[in-house]
From Swiss-Prot:
Pathway: Glycan biosynthesis; glycogen biosynthesis. The active site is at D431 (nucleophile), E484 (proton donor). GO terms for molecular function: 1,4-alpha-glucan branching enzyme activity; cation binding; hydrolase activity, hydrolyzing O-glycosyl compounds. This is 1,4-alpha-glucan branching enzyme GlgB. It comes from Synechococcus sp. (strain CC9902). SMART domains: Aamy. Belongs to the glycosyl hydrolase 13 family. GlgB subfamily. Pfam families: Alpha-amylase, Alpha-amylase_C, CBM_48, GlgB_N.
Length: 764
């Protein structure tokens, strides 16, 4: 190529670089071989002078082709270890040349697996990575934007001017750039220019940290370096059946559990105060707690209550507090509202040290339309379906992932592995699964597209959920994967190789609705609705169910649990205690939302915090004691959890006494052969001499009674237990003559060590 042609070519390249329209800067910039040896070309917008520092040499560059392309000749390949002295705006700096590093970060196998949708650790390639190339430290930026005309990195490193750092386009729609000299804490975004020339500034989809709202830039963060101390917990978790244990979950929203004063900032380990993150305006002067403060306050509280797990409503980064976290923009980052990624790791580590598992809500069903997020990412519908009839939740104002695209599924499946690997979480609850499974979910006729078979099922989402659960249990066999699925979709908790969705637990939404409908009734009318309280047993073994009284039931005018109950305050408290006790003795794992454990009165409001002052009142303290003791009883009695998903674990004694609204049943443990007798009276009328059949004669100790005085009850009961009578009823030859307190549930345990003679002898 002649000199004039080269000159013309370089002028065109300079114009393309200046206008952010060059997708292959490494073809022009950095060390380039030529007839005389090597030419180093440097792209340095608005610089007045650039000097090439090569060993002891200082070579002044020239700008023969474009005022921002600085060139210098060398007889041999300078490699990547040279530096540049840059004079710009009266300031002189020295730096390495980003375009001296030609290393391809995303390898051929990485691209192949990603294109297949099977790169389970794709975050180790995508995003912003602190690394070294040729001994030089910096950050490798890697982005997937296959339809973009160009992509650039902008941020603190270049005064937010996308012209400075154009990225190199690789195969498979990957863009890369190594920027030497950057460190953790650098703010950045990607500037993406569409084929039509429109410019979009996007946060990193694989960003590992983001700014505190309302700002939304990504932040360079270290993935490695935290020193975990939970190895024994992790080994034990993955060596056992995840369901063969008591599971009692405290569901909570970190930002509205309790607030602190903005006048009392958290003091960091370096002795400096952390800038407070304001809470919402319901409490002027309030700030959010940090992950570190939650470690000191929340974990001891949950441990004292006896819960086995904490479930965190979404802690992935999200811009709007009012979404409760369910409109995610930062999938690979814990929200910065409460601190740094390492501080969240320390929170999980501390939970494990105290014997508490951590479950997070995971939201792969939709994402928001925020301009800095995934929507219309590279000027096309990259992550979402283009047709709103399948790509948009109009009622929620959000977009739906295109599960048919391999790279999109890979983004989500790898995200699941990421949270377990990077943050040692123990489980997920997948939100709004029904919205994923049905194409006509919340859509009128004419506003949804049928599947390839003409049906309403979203077969793409089904395959995605199956893949996600298969991969999760392949990597973490002891994990919990919980579906919030509100329909009768079959085999939700069956393994994927049997055609199921692959979850190992499903929220029992039918039980929840039936229970709340029943307990909201005036007790006199409950006799006509006995089916509400008993129906769940007829289907409870069709799935692995978790009983949940969640946040969804205490918002939007539904009232909190206590205020759903009829009657005066005494009856409200008693009904609440009876419902919670029935929940704990019914087959299935347990979840309740924060505030229910002490009888919160007001609806949950994300802008406020819980009514902790209620614990100054004995009835609320009594409900808290009840929940504490329910968890103690639950964990101490394998009959209440070991056979949750086996019909052996439950046996009705009598479910037909609707006239008295009384039920009785046994919970049984196949391993030890032990059992418990549970009797519940769901009216305010107490019953003396109420007879219940039992399988063996002997003494039955009363081990739990919701009407105990310490819980706020009337303290009616059975004097510690009752011996059997040889009076047959309910198909048994022996029975107990019981006192049933009002609005109560009582639990008895057969004591084979106490004879009938001992139990009937007068006490001293």
């Amino acid at each position: 190529m002649g000199g004039a042609a080269v000159l013309d070519w370089m002028v065109q390249d300079g114009v393309r670089l200046e206008n952010c329209r060059h997708d292959h800067p490494l073809a022009v910039l950095g060390p380039q071989p030529d007839d005389q040896g090597w030419t180093v070309r440097v792209w340095m917008p608005e610089a007045q002078k650039v000097t090439l520092l090569l060993g002891s040499q200082e070579i002044v560059t020239s700008t023969p082709n474009h005022p921002w392309i600085f060139e210098a000749s060398t007889p041999s390949d300078p490699g990547s270890n040279y530096k540049l002295r840059v004079e710009r705006g009266g300031i002189t700096t020295e730096q390495h040349d980003p375009w001296a590093f030609r290393h391809e970060w995303m390898g051929e196998m990485d691209r192949h697996l990603f294109a297949e949708g099977n790169h389970h650790h794709i975050w180790q390639r995508m995003g912003a990575h602190l690394t070294q190339i040729d001994g030089i430290s910096g950050v490798m930026f890697c982005l997937w934007a296959p339809n973009a005309l160009t992509a650039s990195v902008l941020g603190d490193l270049n005064s937010w001017d996308g012209r400075h750092h154009p990225m190199q386009k690789r195969l498979g729609g990957i863009w890369e750039l190594f920027v030497p000299g950057l460190d953790a804490g650098t703010l950045y975004k990607y500037e993406i220019r569409s084929q039509e020339g429109h410019c979009y500034q996007k946060a990193d989809p694989y960003g590992f940290q983001h700014e505190v709202r309302p700002d939304n830039s990504s932040v360079v963060a270290r993935l490695e370096g935290y020193s975990w101390s939970d190895s024994s917990w992790m080994q034990d978790r993955d060596s056992r059946n995840a369901l063969d244990q008591p599971i009692s979950v405290y569901e909570m929203h970190i930002g509205s559990w309790i607030h602190a004063s903005a006048d009392e900032p958290w003091i960091q380990p370096d002795g400096q105060p952390r800038a407070p993150v304001p809470a919402a305006d319901m409490k002027p002067g309030a700030r959010l707690l940090t992950y570190a403060e939650l470690s000191d306050r929340l974990i001891p509280y949950v441990k004292e209550r006896g819960f086995t797990h904490i479930e965190l409503m979404p802690i992935t980064e999200h811009p709007f507090d009012g979404s409760w976290g369910y409109q995610v923009t930062g999938w690979y980052a814990p929200t910065s509202r409460y601190g740094t990624p390492d501080e969240f790791r320390a929170f999980v580590d501390r939970c494990h040290a105290e014997g508490i598992g951590v479950i997070i809500d995971w939201v792969p069903g939709h994402f928001p339309k925020d301009a800095h997020g995934l929507a219309f990412f590279d000027g096309t519908h990259l992550y979402e379906h283009g047709d709103p009839r399948i790509g948009e939740h109009k009622e929620w104002g959000t977009l739906i992932f295109n599960y048919s695209r391999n790279e999109v599924r890979n983004f989500l499946v790898a995200n699941l592995v990421f949270w377990f690997e990077q943050f040692h979480i123990d489980g997920i609850r997948v939100d709004a699964v029904a919205s994923m499974l049905y194409r006509d979910y919340l859509r009128p006729d004419g506003e949804w597209l049928p599947n390839e078979n003409g049906g309403r099922e979203n077969t793409e989402a089904v395959r995605f959920l199956q893949q996600a659960n298969h991969v999760l249990f392949q990597h973490y066999p002891g994990a919990l994967s919980i579906a919030e699925e509100s329909t009768t979709w079959p085999m939700v908790t069956q393994p994927t190789d049997m055609g199921g969705l692959g979850f190992n637990l499903k929220w029992n939404m039918g039980w929840m609705h039936d229970m709340l409908d029943y307990f909201e009734l005036d007790p006199w009318f409950r006799q006509f609705h006995q089916n509400n309280i008993t129906f769940s047993i007829w289907y409870t073994y069709t799935e692995n169910f978790m009983l949940a009284l969640s946040h969804d039931e205490v918002v939007h005018g539904k009232s909190h649990l206590l205020h759903k109950m009829p009657g005066d305050d005494w009856q409200k408290y008693a009904n609440t205690r009876a419902l919670l006790a029935y929940m704990w003795t019914h087959p299935g794992k347990k979840t309740i939302f924060m505030g229910m454990e002490f009888g919160q009165r007001a609806e949950w409001n994300v802008w406020g915090d819980l009514e902790w002052d209620l614990l100054n009142y004995e009835p609320h303290k009594g409900i808290q004691r009840l929940v504490d003791d329910l968890n103690v009883l639950y964990k101490a009695q394998p009959a209440l959890w070991r056979d949750d998903f086996d019909q052996f674990g439950f046996q009705w004694i009598d479910c037909n006494d609707n006239r008295h609204s009384v039920i009785s049943f046994m919970r049984r443990d196949s391993a030890s052969g032990t059992w418990l007798v549970v009797v519940a009276n769901f009216t305010p009328q107490s019953h003396a001499n109420y007879r219940v059949g039992v399988p063996l004669e002997g003494f039955y100790e009363e081990i739990f009674n919701t009407d105990a005085a310490k819980y706020g009850g009337s303290n009616l009961g059975n004097m510690g237990g009752k011996p059997t009578d040889a009076c047959g009823i309910h198909g048994y030859e022996h029975s107990l003559d019981l006192c049933l307190p009002p609005l109560s549930l009582v639990v008895f345990q057969h004591d084979p060590k106490r004879t009938l003679i001992e139990s009937s002898a007068p006490s001293d």
